[in-house]
Amino acid sequence: MFEPDFVTLKTDDIVISACQAVMEDDGFCGYCLRIENNSNDKIQILGKDFSLTDDQGNSYLRSEIGFNGEILELNPGEYFEFEDMMPVSFRAAVLYGTCRISKEHVKQIKNIKIPALELFTNQRSSLVLN
């Protein structure tokens, strides 16, 4: 059985973990993302700005409000998991970026980095790049 290798970053009691998702079709590449609220405040996940740079040097930006258009709220101790996949024309790429998060009692929006994740279309495991 495949056990994914998660890479993790922690910023201000927000933990973001990511790993490559195994795809049966080599024409697709996928990833899993987990956002944990380890703070004492309720948080809102307002959006994401993800970049993908392939092994040919091409860059793609995906900027969205929320996740799938939904702005999420997480109470202390709660987490959210998200999976996504994309058709690809490369053998390897790096996924990186930020999530826009605000805490309930702090009227400030922060860009929290996601861990950089190397993705492969031939289903090799991920590598830590941070």
Locate predicted features.
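Short, solvent-exposed loop/turn segments enriched in Ser/Thr/Gly
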Residues: 27-32, 96
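Asparagine-centered strand-capping/turn motif at beta-strand->loop junctions
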Residues: 34-39
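Beta-rich interaction modules in large eukaryotic scaffold/regulatory proteins
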Residues: 52, 64, 73, 112-121
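Intrinsically disordered, low-complexity Pro/Gly/Ser/Thr-rich segments with frequent PxxP/GP/PP motifs
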Residues: 60-92
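Terminal connector regions
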Residues: 2-4, 86-130
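Low-complexity, acidic Ser/Thr/Pro/Gly-rich terminal tails and inter-domain linkers that flank the onset
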Residues: 1-27, 127
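Short acidic, flexible loop segments centered on an aromatic residue
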Residues: 42-60, 101
